[in-house]
UniProtKB/Swiss-Prot annotation:
Its main location: cytoplasm. One of its GO terms (biological process) is tRNA modification. This is tRNA(Ile)-lysidine synthase. The gene is tilS. Ligates lysine onto the cytidine present at position 34 of the AUA codon-specific tRNA(Ile) that contains the anticodon CAU, in an ATP-dependent manner. Cytidine is converted to lysidine, thus changing the amino acid specificity of the tRNA from methionine to isoleucine. It comes from Actinobacillus pleuropneumoniae serotype 3 (strain JL03). Belongs to the tRNA(Ile)-lysidine synthase family. GO terms for cellular component: cytoplasm. It catalyses: cytidine(34) in tRNA(Ile2) + L-lysine + ATP = lysidine(34) in tRNA(Ile2) + AMP + diphosphate + H(+). CDD domains: TilS_N.
């Protein structure tokens, strides 16, 4: 019985969790899961993502709403715009999860109706892309996407079992006409390839699932073995990786440490070619070079012996403001906030707080805040003027942050670089 299978999965993975959100497309898989979940008497909400890709999309949304109303399950409709630049399938998936991330609550878990046949397709698509063990792990019963947890309780259940249950219970569901279009890779596998494979090897999907599980276990072991070293070299709060020792490591170890660091920083995984480019242009670059590479929505930059992962950084317009005692100053473009406490300066940015003690003669003195300074500068209480570039280097301020780092002046003398 599917209900028994579902109850076993919930008891195993979420024995005390009560709040769930179901991703409801209206297709046979999610309709079956909706009815099963309704019997478990959970605190359940259902969300339907309206992609706007089909002329029938409005009808599908209305159907899902009616089914939820009949089962007395709260229903949410989210409309999204699909970015097709990476393909419709990838764009729709990204838009779907982004929308769910906006509505799901911190105490809720997303439930999806992925099943055994979906797992086989995902594994074969990863194989086609030349993925390593991380990609070949395919889907796990419990996964994560940015800020929420995903639970796939039907991952060991075949499509045939789901169809049989739906027919026995006389459920109704929608049929997405695009599922028959073998132009899409997943549909090609589902419609053209797997029926032939399953005729030859009856338990093919179960064997693929076993291989995916082996890959997942190997990936977990790899991460466990590298965890201490990653902790030694990575600063995740600053999205920074110390690569000074990396030339001594094997290429495989370099690749895995960089992949794990990028993943934990929330970056999209680079391809093998991109990863080799990162290694060649950053790890083996001269120490005085500052290479930078675009990686999806991020920039990967090197400064001295560190890699940094940053977003797109704007250079603010010329900024110069007074800062008086007992005054706060909000800096532009999310650069942070300064407070003059009289005897010290507090600099807050991204939850991090630094306190800079003022020299006694500057207690309660009026100061000035800039975000850039050209040419030479005189450090407070020092006789000689130095190039500002040298002061940045001494303070280890990366090149791309030098117009986003607050400079505290007393008259024309530099008191602090807030970094």
């Amino acid at each position: 019985m599917l209900l028994d299978t579902l109850q076993t999965q919930f008891r195993h993975y979420f024995p005390t969790q009560r709040n769930f959100v179901l991703g409801l497309s209206g297709g046979i898989d999610s309709i079956v899961l909706l009815h099963l979940l309704a019997e478990l008497q959970l605190n359940l909400r259902a969300v339907h993502i309206h992609h706007g890709l089909s002329p029938n999309a409005d009808n599908w949304a209305a159907f899902c709403e009616q089914v939820c109303k009949r089962l007395k399950i709260p229903f949410i409709l989210q409309k999204v715009t699909v970015d097709r630049s990476e393909g419709i399938e990838a764009g729709a998936r990204a838009a779907r999860y982004q929308a769910i991330g906006e509505i799901i609550q911190p105490n809720e878990v997303l439930v999806t109706a992925h099943h055994l046949d979906d797992q086989t397709e995902t594994f074969l698509l990863a194989l086609k892309r030349g993925s390593g063990i991380k990609g070949l792990s395919a889907m796990q019963a419990v996964g994560f996407w940015q800020n929420f947890t995903i639970f796939r309780p039907l991952l060991n259940v075949s499509k045939a079992q789901i169809e049989q249950y739906a027919l026995q219970q006389q459920f109704t569901w929608i049929e997405d006409e695009s599922n028959h279009d073998s132009h899409y890779d997943r549909n090609f596998l589902r419609n053209e390839v797997l029926p032939i494979v399953n005729q030859r090897w009856q338990h093919f999907s179960q064997m693929v699932a076993r291989s995916a599980q082996h890959c997942a276990e190997q990936q977990m072991l790899l991460e466990e073995l590298l965890a201490q070293e990653l902790q030694r070299y990575a600063d995740f709060s600053e999205k920074r990786l110390n690569i000074e020792a990396f030339p001594q490591f094997s290429l495989a170890k370099q690749q895995q440490l960089i992949r794990l660091w990028l993943e934990k920083c929330g970056a999209q995984m680079p391809s093998t070619a991109q990863l080799m480019q990162i290694i060649q242009q950053t790890i083996y670059a001269d120490v005085d070079k500052n290479p930078q590479l675009k990686l999806a929505d991020f920039w990967l930059r090197r400064y001295q012996h560190h890699l940094y992962l940053t977003g797109e950084l704007l250079e603010p317009d010329d900024f110069c403001q007074p800062l008086f005692a007992q005054q706060s100053l909000t800096l532009p473009d999310g650069i942070g906030e300064l407070q003059h406490l009289g005897d010290s300066i507090i600099y807050q940015k991204s939850g991090k707080i630094d306190r800079l003690l003022l020299p006694k003669v500057l207690v309660n003195a009026p100061l000035q805040v800039k975000l850039t300074h050209q040419g030479k500068v005189k450090q407070y209480a020092k006789p000689m003027r130095e190039e500002m570039k040298k002061r940045y280097q001494q303070a280890q301020v990366p090149v791309w942050l030098r117009k986003r780092t607050p400079l505290i002046f007393f008259h024309d003398q530099l008191v602090f670089i807030c970094h």
